[in-house]
């Protein structure tokens, strides 16, 4: 019987950070939980980052994942927004790293390709495939659905890497 691996996907953002937890065993996927962390826009940047860090740390402690998958940041025309997203992403990398989890990073196009089969697709397509692959999945936001897609992407790439290691050993 295959070992069960618990994966948390994290879709970082300063306003909202989505998270999704799945269990992965052999070729079986099971939804565990998903949600969205929000920071208080009335607070200063440092306080907002602390809110995200505490929220992620609490989720990691509650669900005890074995591995984390975090979305790569993308650069847009608004440099300030990109910097803030980068800072939120640093929290998304730091919290699982401090919990001694291996952290894997995936570009948005790689996540889309893993979940819907093409690198450029609408959010609705991703959300529909998350529901197909995880029929019991419940998510309260687009960010939580994207986080589940990240966890699914990691389960796919983890399987490929494991299979490759076995056949080349």
Curated annotation (Swiss-Prot):
PROSITE patterns: RUVC. GO terms for molecular function: crossover junction DNA endonuclease activity; DNA binding; magnesium ion binding. GO terms for biological process: DNA recombination; DNA repair. Mg(2+) 2 binds at residue 71. Pfam families: RuvC (PF02075). The active site is at 11, 71, 143. It is found in: Cytoplasm. Its main location: cytoplasm. Mg(2+) 1 binds at residues 11, 143. GO terms for cellular component: cytoplasm; Holliday junction resolvase complex. It comes from the Bacteria. Keywords: Cytoplasm, DNA damage, DNA recombination, DNA repair, DNA-binding, Endonuclease, Hydrolase, Magnesium, Metal-binding, Nuclease. InterPro entries: RNaseH-like_sf (IPR012337), RNaseH_sf (IPR036397), X-over_junc_endoDNase_Mg_BS (IPR020563), X-over_junc_endoDNase_RuvC (IPR002176). Its cofactor is Mg(2+). It is an enzyme of class 3 (hydrolase). It catalyses: Endonucleolytic cleavage at a junction such as a reciprocal single-stranded crossover between two homologous DNA duplexes (Holliday junction). Its EC number is 3.1.21.10. Binds 2 Mg(2+) ion per subunit. NCBIfam families: ruvC (TIGR00228). Homodimer which binds Holliday junction (HJ) DNA. The HJ becomes 2-fold symmetrical on binding to RuvC with unstacked arms; it has a different conformation from HJ DNA in complex with RuvA. In the full resolvosome a probable DNA-RuvA(4)-RuvB(12)-RuvC(2) complex forms which resolves the HJ. The RuvA-RuvB-RuvC complex processes Holliday junction (HJ) DNA during genetic recombination and DNA repair. Endonuclease that resolves HJ intermediates. Cleaves cruciform DNA by making single-stranded nicks across the HJ at symmetrical positions within the homologous arms, yielding a 5'-phosphate and a 3'-hydroxyl group; requires a central core of homology in the junction. The consensus cleavage sequence is 5'-(A/T)TT(C/G)-3'. Cleavage occurs on the 3'-side of the TT dinucleotide at the point of strand exchange. Belongs to the RuvC family. This is Crossover junction endodeoxyribonuclease RuvC. It comes from Bartonella quintana (strain Toulouse). The lineage of its organism: Bacteria, Pseudomonadati, Pseudomonadota, Alphaproteobacteria, Hyphomicrobiales.
């Amino acid at each position: 019987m295959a070992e069960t691996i618990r994966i948390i996907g994290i879709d970082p953002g300063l306003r909202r950070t989505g998270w999704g937890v799945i269990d992965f065993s052999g070729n079986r996927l099971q939804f565990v939980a998903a949600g969205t962390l929000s920071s208080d826009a009335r607070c200063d940047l440092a306080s907002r980052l602390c809110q995200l860090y505490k929220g992620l740390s609490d989720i990691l402690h509650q669900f005890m994942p074995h591995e984390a998958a975090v979305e790569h940041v993308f650069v847009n025309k608004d440099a300030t927004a990109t910097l803030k997203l980068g800072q939120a992403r640093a929290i998304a990398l730091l919290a699982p790293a401090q919990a001694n989890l291996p952290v894997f990073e995936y570009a948005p196009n790689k996540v889309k390709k893993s979940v819907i089969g093409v690198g450029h697709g609408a959010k609705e397509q991703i959300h529909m495939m998350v529901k197909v692959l995880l029929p019991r999945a419940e998510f309260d936001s687009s960010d939580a659905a994207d986080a589940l897609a990240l966890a699914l992407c990691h389960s796919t790439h983890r399987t490929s890497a494991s299979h490759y290691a076995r056949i080349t050993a």
